[in-house]
């Protein structure tokens, strides 16, 4: 497996990983969860059950991201944080509908902070797109307004939107982080 890193001079530096080294690299992957995120024990329980490292950190935006712990033998001489990934998790369609109705527009400001981030994911827990279309949520916002709001913001911000069952949320967060790592180092 090869790794491409861009040096300050714009020159690509290429490293090759054996399967064993790649597994070691994955053992240095740490899921970061925002210190401002309400603790989601089901996500942390999943990560713990799979022996996936995680830690709480104040993130600039979003709820989850990842880092690679220092591993000089694999080319990571210090902890490396991946600012090109932002995962925002919502508990339900009701929560995101409520975010669009808020007068203080915190959610829209957060989305604006995400515009310069390469990989942005919005994960909505336990509901589905059908719940949006059918109006199966608690909010003053009708289903057509919510759908249009989501589509407009998705187009402007360029984020990926997934509906994920609660029991699969930890796995989804890990797989997104791993995929981002793979696409960063295995180009």
Where are these regions (language model features)?
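Non-catalytic C-terminal interaction segments of nucleic acid-processing enzymes
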Residues: 1-82, 94-187
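Conserved catalytic cores of phosphodiester-cleaving nucleases, focusing on short active-site segments
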Residues: 83-91
């Amino acid at each position: 497996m090869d790794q491409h890193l861009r040096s300050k001079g714009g020159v690509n530096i290429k490293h090759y990983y054996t399967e064993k080294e790649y597994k070691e690299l994955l053992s240095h992957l740490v899921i970061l969860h925002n210190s401002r995120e309400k603790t989601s024990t089901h996500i942390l329980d999943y990560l713990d059950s799979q022996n996936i490292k995680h830690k709480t950190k104040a993130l600039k935006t979003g709820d989850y991201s990842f880092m690679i712990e220092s591993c000089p033998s694999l080319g990571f001489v210090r902890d490396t944080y991946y600012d090109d990934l932002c995962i925002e998790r919502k508990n339900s369609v009701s929560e995101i509908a409520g975010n669009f109705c808020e007068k203080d527009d915190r959610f829209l400001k957060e989305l604006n902070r995400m515009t310069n981030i390469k990989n942005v994911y919005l994960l909505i827990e336990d509901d589905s797109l059908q719940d949006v279309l059918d109006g199966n949520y608690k909010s003053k916002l009708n289903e057509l307004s919510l759908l249009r709001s989501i589509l407009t913001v998705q187009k402007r911000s360029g984020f990926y939107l997934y509906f994920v069952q609660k029991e699969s949320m930890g796995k989804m967060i890990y797989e997104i982080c791993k995929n981002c790592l793979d696409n960063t180092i295995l180009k």
